[in-house]
């Protein structure tokens, strides 16, 4: 049983800007796992922080928790034009993930936002909510991954056909996302290489999602393309950050060199992502039972 005092201690670590970013991330993922109104309240306090990376991760976690009590704070973040585009985008995506149709009107409104990543995110969230209404009771988390995705995976299982849809920029973004998540679920080298080709497509939002999915897939066939995208200083920081975190999750020796090289990058979100990714690399190659270890850090060993 988790006590109120333990949740508070983990929450204080999350919102304490003097703490190392890795510790704050581990606290965040602990709160996400615990759930409930107190966890949501602590996570919501973090949106005043100066780190866009942390704030974007706060929004992501609130979406994954799928608790409608998080809707008001996510709406306020989406509406706040002082928040960085990657933070507003993640708030829009989180509203789609929660799946409550009451935000459909708001998401439609922001589907024409002047920030293209925000507009595209809200368009996808609208399509997801409409899909949920058309397919009541269908599992959207089916498959080997437990994440709540911005689009349900396509029913197609052929990697070649999925690759064609993924890379066809004339197709609706929603259908390309469906192909992306289907490729992830199929898994293996061929799927990883097909996904990695998506890192060269036109939409920055799309490229960043490809980076995220390759991190979930954790296949080393994608390492060279992820490292090349991280190294491309003309690339959107939102995309480079996702590639860095994917390299941390894949956690092969070749990933380590790339992450160390960009830990002093001029873009704050990139260097912070490398910092968090190196912590993830250590976790993947270490003996820790779980990454979200906020409770273990509070409790003495038995």
Curated annotation (Swiss-Prot):
Its EC number is 1.14.99.29. The keyword Signal does not apply. GO terms for biological process: peptidyl-lysine modification to peptidyl-hypusine. It catalyses: [eIF5A protein]-deoxyhypusine + AH2 + O2 = [eIF5A protein]-hypusine + A + H2O. Transmembrane segments: none annotated. Pathway: Protein modification; eIF5A hypusination. Fe cation 1 binds at residues 56, 241-242. Its cofactor is Fe(2+). HEAT-like PBS-type repeats lie at residues 54-80, 87-113, 175-201, 206-232, 239-265. Keywords: Acetylation, Hypusine biosynthesis, Iron, Metal-binding, Monooxygenase, Oxidoreductase, Repeat. The modification N-acetylmethionine is found at residue 1. InterPro entries: ARM-like, ARM-type_fold, Deoxyhypusine_hydroxylase, PBS_lyase_HEAT. GO terms for molecular function: deoxyhypusine monooxygenase activity; iron ion binding. Fe cation 2 binds at residues 89-90, 208. Binds 2 Fe(2+) ions per subunit. Catalyzes the hydroxylation of the N(6)-(4-aminobutyl)-L-lysine intermediate produced by deoxyhypusine synthase/DHPS on a critical lysine of the eukaryotic translation initiation factor 5A/eIF-5A. This is the second step of the post-translational modification of that lysine into an unusual amino acid residue named hypusine. Hypusination is unique to mature eIF-5A factor and is essential for its function. Belongs to the deoxyhypusine hydroxylase family. This is Deoxyhypusine hydroxylase. It comes from Rattus norvegicus.
